[in-house]
Amino acid sequence: MIRLTAAAILLASAAPVWAETHTITPGEGAQERLQEALILAEPGDEIVLEAGRYTLTDGLSLDVDGVTVRGAGMDGTVLDFTAQEGSGEGLLVTSDNVTLRDFALENPKGDGIKSKGADNIVYYRIRVTWTNGPDPTNGAYGIYPVESTGVLVDGAKVTGASDAGIYVGQSDQITVRNSIAEANVAGIEIENSRNALVEHNIATRNTGGILVFDLPGLPVMGGGNVIVANNLVVANDTANFAPPGNIVAGVRRGTGIMVMANDGVLIENNIIDENPTAPIMVIAYTQPWEDERYQPFPLNVVVGDNIYGRGGDDPQLDGGEMLVAAFGGSLPPVMWDGLGSLYAIAGTPGWSLNLTEPGTAETAARPAPLDVPAPEGEFDRSGIGAPAELDDRIR
């Protein structure tokens, strides 16, 4: 029995040796060779994409647990979907414990990389770019994990998404860090998700920099427990180019950080500059809804110590010019609609619309300087962020 147990231990410890490396090179037949590797891979395998440009005409998919797809760098390995037929994602992942790292996608007809129901997924140094710049015909999302527990996005860069560059939806235990979101409608969006940490990112030249939303009518609602900290949110002044009907089509040009209908959000230690509508905006959901489960108010939102530069000087709001004149040339950095519950450290410059119910028109506002209580005690950070073991895959 002792010998059998020892043998079993040795066999188990040797299991990783069985993992295979599938190396793919650019050139003729790359589409078929790469998709075949994604289909035939076994758990623990690594698919290596050598440096070069891969001309692809169809989307790719991965449905095997525990696979790593590794390129030669976000500027070294480029999956070029300019000639893609159809309108699907560049890459769809529907399996757990997947690591995607060090490669780029350009010009997918639909989303860049979508992972659905893919728990413990890592996006590391991934780039998604629509090379024609802001355009409503671009794909909606660059990096798009949804319905997942355990999401790490680290060192990514997304440019040109017609909805959100980095979007995490209906998920739990999330970290988005060290990433750049530029010239998208929404730079980074956390939607209907809990326990998210958004830190050390750059959000610039988007319509809105960082959005934390909760929307009705989705399978997962009740977003909250989110920290937005240590980010550079600057010059988010791109005209909104979302297709009509998208929820982000209502985001005002010049929004820095926006919280809508979440419960428990901390905004601290960010540098927020040159966002002409509002450096920080905290509001209730503005549209009609029928879902009885839905809670539309921003609750327990805490604005901590942030660095505010220029902003609020060209607000895309009804009566914006009169508001600017009334406040002496620019609106204070923190804008609250007056609904729900907001806390801010002493001395936080801000203003309130003093609305009385969700969906009230801005013309019914009674603008006044911000008058909210200071936060009571420390923000509860427990359980926020991706599981620590996801970091081990990128070390």
Predicted regions and their residues:
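Short, T/G/N/S-enriched strand-turn elements that build extracellular solenoid repeat scaffolds
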Residues: 34-40, 55-64, 69, 80, ...
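Bacterial N-terminal signal peptides that target proteins for export
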Residues: 1-5
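Acidic, glycine- and Ser/Thr-rich low-complexity intrinsically disordered tracts
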Residues: 288, 293-395
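Right-handed parallel beta-helix/beta-spiral solenoid domain characteristic of secreted/periplasmic
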Residues: 20-32, 46, 66-109, 132
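Right-handed parallel beta-helix
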Residues: 72-75, 96-107, 119-132, 149-162, ...
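Cleavable N-terminal signal peptides
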Residues: 6-7, 17
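Extracellular beta-strand/beta-solenoid scaffold signature
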Residues: 31-35, 57, 81-91, 107-114, ...
